[in-house]
Regions:
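N-terminal secretory signal peptides
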Residues: 1-12
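C-terminal segment of N-terminal export signals and the immediately downstream linker at the start
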Residues: 32-51, 55, 204-205
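Mid-length scaffold segments of soluble, non-membrane domains
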Residues: 91, 104-132
Length: 205
């Protein structure tokens, strides 16, 4: 692959996606698929423990972008919208129809079952399809790692799966985990304070 190749156009060149394998997946809080993963037809909750629902789901605009996405309202949407905003500003711009969120559970397996609870989002899924490698340039990957670090284990990334899914971000804690509320409150504070939050340039950083 040439250095001049671009992932989905308009972004930094493609490079080999650096994966951390099994250890990275465990650290990120994503359950790796078993030999015979249960389908959504035999379960009532996603792999992250959140129940399937069509209640409390809203299609929400992502501030600073032309895009919107269907997510579970409340702390979940606050956190995932923040992730999308940082991705848009720091990794790759997100166009109007380049997000996918809540969807019916039928046919979903493994980590994708979390879409049915509104607790996961795909960012530019056509550019970063399931199983694809070489879709992020190292500086972009560094930003993704920084986003995960900022979220303190509350958010997991599909790039750490054995079969990578770089478009996928999900809530990685169970319902009621206080870390989710704490992170959501911090994000709300950042968005209300001048000079903080996604998209803010920090000089000298």
């Amino acid at each position: 692959m040439r250095d001049t190749d671009r992932p989905g156009g308009g972004g930094l060149p493609r490079r080999t996606l650096l994966l951390t394998g099994l250890a990275g997946a465990v650290a990120a809080g994503i359950s790796l698929p078993s030999a015979a993963p249960a389908s959504a037809a035999t379960r009532t909750a996603g792999t992250n423990g959140w129940p399937f629902t069509s209640t409390g789901i809203s299609t929400l605009p992502v501030p600073g972008t032309p895009a919107s996405v269907a997510l579970l309202e409340g702390d979940v949407s606050t956190v995932l919208l923040h992730v999308v905003r940082r991705f848009h500003y720091e990794v790759e711009e997100v166009a109007r129809h380049e997000l996918a969120g809540h969807r019916p559970a039928a046919g979903l397996t493994g980590h994708t079952t979390n879409y049915a609870s509104g607790t996961a989002v795909e960012i530019r899924p056509a550019a970063y399809p399931l199983g694809a490698t070489g879709v992020l340039f190292p500086p972009q990957l560094a930003v993704v790692r920084d986003i995960l670090k900022e979220c303190g284990g509350v958010v997991a990334w599909g790039g750490h799966l054995r079969r990578p899914h770089a478009a996928h971000f999900q809530i990685a804690v169970r319902p009621g985990d206080p870390r989710l509320r704490g992170l959501a409150q911090r994000i709300k504070g950042w968005t209300q304070a001048p000079g903080q939050g996604a998209g803010v340039l920090t000089l000298g950083a």
